[in-house]
Amino acid sequence: MAASSSSSSPAAASAPFAAPGPHRRPGLALRPSPPTPPSSSLSCCRASPAAAAVSSVSATAAPNRGPRGMGLRCRASEGAAAAARKEAPLKVMISGAPASGKGTQCRMIVEKYGLVHISTGDLLRAEVSSGTEIGKKAKEYMDNGMLVPDQVVTDMVVSRLSQPDVRERGWLLDGYPRSYAQAQSLESMKIRPDIFIVLEVPDDILIDRCVGRRLDPETGKIYHIKNFPPENDEVSARLVTRSDDTFEKVKSRLDTYKQNSEAVIPTYSDLLNQIDGNRQVEVVFNEIDSLLQKICENASFNMLAKTNGKPQDSKDTTASKNEFRGIPTRLNNIPHSREIRKYFYNDVLVATRHAVEDKKTRLQIDINIPELNPEMDVYRIGTLMELVRELSLSFADDGKRVKVCVQGSMGQGAFAGIPLQLAGTRKILEIMDWGEYGAKGTFINFGAVGASEVDKEDDMFILIAPQNAVGNCIIDDMKAMTDAAGDRPVILVNPRLKDMPGSSGVMQTMGRDMRLKYAASFETCYSFRLLFYAGSFYPIMGALRMAYPNKYEIYRRVDEPNGQERYVLLEEFVEKPTPDEITNAFRPRKNENEKSASGFWGFLSGIL
């Protein structure tokens, strides 16, 4: 296969399945330890004054009957988790129009996560009443009926963010920044949230919430004539409308909010999460809470990796079934570096093992990084072989006998004998280095795809890229093989099972529905594919990932000012998202009745 040019380092261009040497195992792939239960309420970004010091990672020797002997299974201690929380306090920005329910959500966030709630209104009043230098400047403008300049407000916010309690507990910045200049000032000081939440409520609902409000001048209590009426006629008789709650003033405040929001949102587009605020308070908070929990989980794993002095590796330290540590960058540099390839091998391995441990028996792996995308001219068969070797050796470590199956040449018809794309891979597998522990021929054996290849001593089967081709439908052979395998796991690695024409050029219509149904019966345990503009492979716009037992995750690739890049989680789906759902994840949310637009945001229409 042809390899495209790249600017990657020489190490990145190393042979994709080079032997590791006679005195080394070809790849260490140990069994992940059982998942630990999550902490209550997942307040993992809330710092505790009594946080314990970092404890060392405890390792327990796990006896193993596989070819590579004993493996260590490590688990990070709770002390390390506490240190992670202390080092990575949660940082949240929240925005919402008047009467959007923002104040209520802020109270609930602070109550659960212990963040310091910072609003510019409160800051202004506190600074002015305290007579600080910043407060005196602000008072001068306010006394003269002028707006306080952006820089003065920013100085107040930055001063508050630098206080020990904020640095210890994290912060919730309420309604700030309100202008592009304020946002850029924070950016220039590298003050950036983990998430930017926007509460969205239709204009007519917002106006009704405000215009319908009534004030009890005796108690100061706020009522609403429809949503929260007074207790009795006596209270009702003394209610008054606040001067700010007329239709004209509410509409003016709403327009001002929209202008400010439109100016700020582009700065935080990669962190933006728009929440439907026109629901019950608890429902809105549950959605916000799930987003914050996700951030906390990711922060904990990153910090645990840092405290252990090395990148977290799922093969020797596993804290839960959600140990994902982010998507590697520079995936458009081909060939991929050894580090990137090993990263994906580990990611696939952990997800697959979780599925097998959960008694799943018909599994499918779909990984389309550039080196494994058959539609690109850089398809590297060695990368696929390395992945299969890692999977096989990992299960062999547990004493399982793995049959690795490769599809041969075409069978019947005019094209009989013509080799498939991967027809030579069995020979490659046989000459690869399988270590010095005698795995090949004992715990790992090779065969073709078919019922005759299923032996009673086989514990599981890995099928390498089974594919239908013109004149040859592999599905019938696969079905016979899985029937013979019974309840033993069968794992398909990058299958291509769409129906193809027969050797005469006529679609094989007989049994087509049954074949497609069988092909769809395999449960995806791992899926990763990059997202591009339609009809191209550059630039990378984002990624779609699923690692069992987690949901499908859509990520946006974001360019950093220093020439770096990162991937930001946009949305999650229980089922594999449709092209329209993926496209919509990359665009601001619209009314549910509006259809997805084509054009610029239709770039993902052909990816799946």
Swiss-Prot record:
ATP binds at A99, S100, G101, K102, G103, T104, R209, R213, I222, Y223. SUPFAM superfamilies: P-loop containing nucleoside triphosphate hydrolases. Residues 1-20 have a biased composition (Low complexity). Residues 119-148 are annotated as: NMP. InterPro entries: Adenyl_kin_sub (IPR006259), Adenylat/UMP-CMP_kin (IPR000850), Adenylat_kinase_CS (IPR033690), Chloroplast_ADK (IPR053021), DUF1995 (IPR018962), P-loop_NTPase (IPR027417). This is Probable adenylate kinase 5, chloroplastic. Residues 212-245 are annotated as: LID. It is found in: Plastid, Chloroplast. The lineage of its organism: Eukaryota, Viridiplantae, Streptophyta, Embryophyta, Tracheophyta. AMP binds at T120, R125, M146, L147, V148, G175, Y176, P177, R178, Q182, R242, R253. GO terms for molecular function: adenylate kinase activity; ATP binding. It catalyses: AMP + ATP = 2 ADP. Its EC number is 2.7.4.3. It comes from Oryza sativa subsp. japonica (Rice). It is an enzyme of class 2 (transferase). Keywords: ATP-binding, Chloroplast, Kinase, Nucleotide-binding, Plastid, Transferase, Transit peptide. Catalyzes the reversible transfer of the terminal phosphate group between ATP and AMP. Plays an important role in cellular energy homeostasis and in adenine nucleotide metabolism. Residues 1-44 are annotated as: Disordered.
